Every structure is written in C-alpha cells, then in structure tokens.
From Swiss-Prot:
The gene is rpsB. Belongs to the universal ribosomal protein uS2 family. GO terms for biological process: translation. Keywords: Ribonucleoprotein, Ribosomal protein. PANTHER family: 30S RIBOSOMAL PROTEIN S2 PROKARYOTIC AND ORGANELLAR, SMALL RIBOSOMAL SUBUNIT PROTEIN US2M. This is Small ribosomal subunit protein uS2. The keyword Cell inner membrane does not apply. PROSITE patterns: RIBOSOMAL_S2_1, RIBOSOMAL_S2_2. GO terms for cellular component: cytosolic small ribosomal subunit.
Amino acid sequence: MGSIPEFSIRDLMEAGVHLGHKAGRWNPAMAPYIYGVHRYKDIHIIDLRKTAVLLRNALSVLYDVVHRRGRVLFVGTKVQASNVIAEEAARCGQYYVNHRWLGGMLTNWETVSSSIRRLLDFEKLLNDTDAKFTKKELLMFDKKREKLERSLGGIREMGGLPHILFVIDTNKEHIAIQEANKLKIPVVAVLDTNSDPRGVDYPIPGNDDSIRSIDFFCRAVSNTILEAIRSDLMSSGISVAGSVGQAKDGSVVDSGKGKSIAAHKGGGKASKGAAEVVAGGSVVSASGGEDAVVQE
C-alpha cells in the first residue's frame, strides 16, 4: 500500500481543526472527542490526538476504496464548503454534490440517471449549430440545462452509485447520510462538536465551519485519492514518472507523461507561533494568540 499524506498535530491546529462550537450548542454524543472548554471563549476544544488517529484511519479506508477502483462522492453544500468540495473532487478525478442534495440522489439512482441523460441531451441540443430553434426556445433550454448542471454536474460522469461518501457537516447533509446508510454505502465525515455522529462509519472530529479547516480535510482526502490512483497504475505496470494532477478537461493525468488516467475512475511548514500540544496534555500558544487554551 502507498502512503497517505503526512500531517502533524501542529498542522491540524494551524488549520483551526480544534475549534468547536459554543459549549452550550454541543451534541453530548461528541463527548469522547472533546478535550475541554476554552476558558475565555466558552467554546469546546476538539481533542486533536483523537482527530489525528481517526483521520489517518479514514484516509486509509479511502485509499483502499480508490485502489480497488471504487468511486468517492464528496458532499458539502454549505457556503464555506461548496467551492473547495468541487475543486478537490475534480482535482482527484472523483465526484461531488456541492449545491443542494436532492432527495433520492442515491436511493432513486435510476431517476437521477434519467435526469443526467436529460442534462446531456440539453447540452447536445444547445451545441447543435444546425438545430432550428427560436432564441426563446434556446433560452428556455439553457435555463433547464443550468438548473440540472447545478444539481447534477458533479455526478454527471459517475456512472453508478458511489462506493463511499466523504461528508462535510453531518447535520446539513443528514439526508445524504441516511440514504447512504440505507444502501450500506460507508460514510466518512468531519464531525464538529454539535454534530450527530449516528450513521457515520469513519468519523473525523474537527471544525466543519472554518474554510481553512474544510480546505485541510478536503485536500488530505484528495491527495490520498491521487496517491491511491498512482499506486494502482504502477501496480498495473503503467509508468507514472511525474506527479498525478488534473488536465484541463477534468481528467486525472500523469504530469510526467501527460497520459490521461480517467479510466481509473469507477472501475507545510508550520509557523513558529502556532499553538501546539505540550506535556501534560495542555494546549498552549507560543505566540499567545486567540486560539490559546490551557486545560487544567
């Protein structure tokens, strides 16, 4: 097995992964993952030692799924997650829902597939220079295409149900998790201190509101997937001389050869002033920054 991305407790803290919600807004089911309460801000602090272990476990599971050529569906429709979910899923040649989860997106896949075919039909029609339609008709077709693209664009090429979900914000995406549970599709999810961990097979305790934190988790997942693809290609006898990246058309490529590997789909340095965990388990900041905590 290839390696999953390396990270440290310091990396997690610099990304703000440890910062939870106000103590009064917590979900008691998250108690095992909470380190303490910020003495000045009254927010829960997530135990990054547990986050590190569980993140590595989740990344290992994702690696194994992709190495076996399984499909990963990134799900994150909140404003803070929408862009990075789409960017990182595309970067590693996987799939995403970042606008709105449509009920039945998994459990009624046949209907969703039909809608995807309609999207492709609209695109073909709008690109047909010989088509005889009025401007009004073309505008109507384009509006329908845009609506379908917004909802289904990230899964248009998925070709079947995903083999695993990666979710940001389990409270907001509870319907997606319920559908995955019903179909016995495993779920990897970032869980904040107010999250409901039920239905999550591979929890990752962490801040699911901060853009920095969301970006950290999405990049870790994307990099893991790219490493799994690289390893699978090499084990299949395909030379991967350069880094694995994304071509302009969205396919994953070997940048050393420029060779598309889209067929695989489906089938920093730490700053000196950053806070860190020290002896005794207390979290302190060398810079005295606002993230500093002392747990008595």
